[in-house]
A protein has these predicted regions:
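Disulfide-stabilized cysteine-rich extracellular repeat microdomains
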Residues: 39, 82-85, 105, 131
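Zn2+-dependent peptidoglycan hydrolase active-site motif and core
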Residues: 44-84, 110-112
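A generic structural motif
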Residues: 29, 37-39, 72, 80, ...
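Residue-level preference for alpha-helix termini and adjacent loops
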Residues: 31-33, 82, 128
Length: 155
């Protein structure tokens, strides 16, 4: 399996609606809401390919982006004010892909909604996903062989 490092989609750690609250309300797109003003930079959570750019805020999701990652996971970024990537574009973790906003018919204020979807199409809790990803990264680092990390010097 391919290991892909994930990072949060914006600099703020302040959230106002978590995955459990979305599920309890019966949200069709559960995820995590980051409190941030309109115009805040939104970053790609991981390397991948942009597979959806929806610039028409015609429904509850508003202006949105979806990225498919090499491990089969997808990240969705909703309620954006501006998209800064194109469908089919390759992105790297940390690239600015959009600006946050308050678009969509169900939005109550400016924020960034992040959904994470596994390779089977199931929504997963972004907080738990980030925690699991950090643990996997540490485990991989701990099992790295010294030969792979130590430079070779000639006598």
């Amino acid at each position: 399996m391919t290991f892909v490092k994930y990072s949060p989609p914006c600099k703020t750690k302040d959230t106002n609606d978590d995955f459990k609250a979305h599920v309890a309300r019966g949200s069709s797109i559960p995820g995590l809401d980051y409190n941030c003003p309109t115009g805040t930079k939104v970053f790609a959570c991981a390397d991948g390919e942009v597979i959806v750019t929806d610039e028409v805020a015609k429904d509850g999701t508003g202006i949105s982006i979806e990225i498919k990652h090499p491990d089969g996971m997808h990240t969705r970024y909703l309620h954006l004010s501006k998209i800064q990537v194109k469908k089919g574009q390759k992105v790297s973790r940390g690239d600015t892909i959009a600006l946050s906003g308050a678009t969509g018919t169900t939005v109550t204020g400016a924020h960034l909604h992040l959904s994470v979807v596994d390779k089977h199409g199931k929504f997963v809790d972004p907080d738990k996903w980030f925690d699991k990803n950090k643990k996997e990264e540490k485990a991989l680092a701990a099992t790295a062989t010294p030969e792979a990390t130590t430079p070779v010097t000639e006598a």
